[in-house]
Amino acid sequence: MASNLDAVQRLVFAVIHHDDADTAGQALVEAGHRATRIDAQGGFLRRGNAVFMGGVGIEQVDDVIATLRSVSTHAFGQSGTGSAYGIVFVVPVDAFDRL
């Protein structure tokens, strides 16, 4: 989700429905964001899902979320909890480097 090491100020974790993962990955690339995808099951959404994570600048967070929201079409629903298309966590980054 970032190409400039100095610009990485936030780490974005996005958990989305597995059926939206390929489209989401492509949309992130087309929007100029780099991300790592991890396929997972269980956890917050209780079904097959994908976790995208990547470092971004503060000014890119809203664009990443909007990009993911625009391609998320499969809702997760649980009895009594309503439904959601995904969950996004944004965490401050103190340091970032590539090995």
Predicted regions and their residues:
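Positively charged, small/polar-rich N-terminal and surface patches that mediate targeting and assembly
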Residues: 1-99
